Amino acid sequence: MAVYTEVSDDELEDFAAEYDIGQVVSCKGIAEGVENTNYLLQTDQGNYILTLYEKRVNPEELPFFLGLMEHLAAHGLACPTPIHGRDGKALRTLCGRPAAIVSFLKGMWSRRITLGHCAELGPAMATMHLAGADFPLTRANNLSVAGWRPLFESIRPRAAEIKSDLAQSIEDELDYLEAHWPRTLPVGLIHADLFPDNVFFLADKAAGVDRMSGFIDFYFACTDVLAYDIAICLNAWCFEEDGAFNATKARLMLNGYRRVRPLSADELDALPLLARGAAMRFLLTRSYDWLHTPPGAMVKRKDPMEYYRKLRFHQGVTGPGQYGIE
């Protein structure tokens, strides 16, 4: 989440008046994330999230995202749900951009990922995959293997600003991924951006542990290889700050997932390749954002080199056992 578009008090009041959510008390920008403009909206009836859709979000795909959140919530997955206005619409326009208000999900994301967090993540991700099985809409993953080379070409001229030989490294890896990408693995609804800041936890004080309270930010959700979601999480959840891979975290996440949705031998064997692809996807998008984020935007740029180093790790993985598979 981020803030690219400032909303005036008058514009906000007029927009909120379309909903039965009470009187606006405050509206505070949320700086985390990189895709859309987000505000924490407080009214005299409660808290909400106001989102203005920017950049890579195609307005024609917004009914997919909003409908998906409603579908998953109806199937028992904890996630925000769109608030419908008095006219029944969940999507309207604010400051010239598509905009929506969604419910506020209690909890916080953890800045320090523990073994317990990974153990909670696995079964919840599998539950989401199963819940999405009968969602009637589909959406292609525009940031999967077919989209990586065009994205690379858009950063190639300036890639050396990040690392002198980055362009050649990416080109070599893309050649490999395009030649070997799996085409026959189980496909379904995936989140595709299940980073720690999109997973909320609440403290269970009695048990002395954190319990997952839900998933947020479904605006990259799509129809793709289910195990690719797992590969994204191997990258996002299982590396330590010093860059070391934590196989115990990976094992707990994978074991929890497999208890809810067993993985086939083909899916397990494909994990190293899928993890390389996931690292490439975020290396490319982070590189693009690093080079193209507007000056003065209220957004935190994320270091693309983190994913270059993760890619290098996965290139050295020879089998799923190195991810803690038992």
UniProtKB/Swiss-Prot annotation:
Pathway(s) of this molecule: Amino-acid biosynthesis; L-threonine biosynthesis; L-threonine from L-aspartate: step 4/5
EC numbers: 2.7.1.39
Signal peptide per UniProt: none
Gene Ontology biological-process annotations: threonine biosynthetic process
Entry keyword Magnesium: no
Pfam family, one: APH
InterPro entries: Aminoglycoside_PTrfase, Homoserine_kinase_II, Kinase-like_dom_sf, Pseudomonas-type_ThrB
One GO molecular-function entry: ATP binding
Catalytic activity: L-homoserine + ATP = O-phospho-L-homoserine + ADP + H(+)
Coiled-coil segments on the chain, per record: none
Keyword DNA repair in annotation: no
Keywords: Amino-acid biosynthesis, ATP-binding, Kinase, Nucleotide-binding, Threonine biosynthesis, Transferase
Transmembrane segments: none
Family matches, as NCBIfam families: PRK05231.1 (NF003558), thrB_alt (TIGR00938)
Family: Belongs to the pseudomonas-type ThrB family.
Official protein name in the record: Homoserine kinase
Biological classification of the source: Bacteria, Pseudomonadati, Pseudomonadota, Alphaproteobacteria, Rhodospirillales
Protein encoded by which gene: thrB
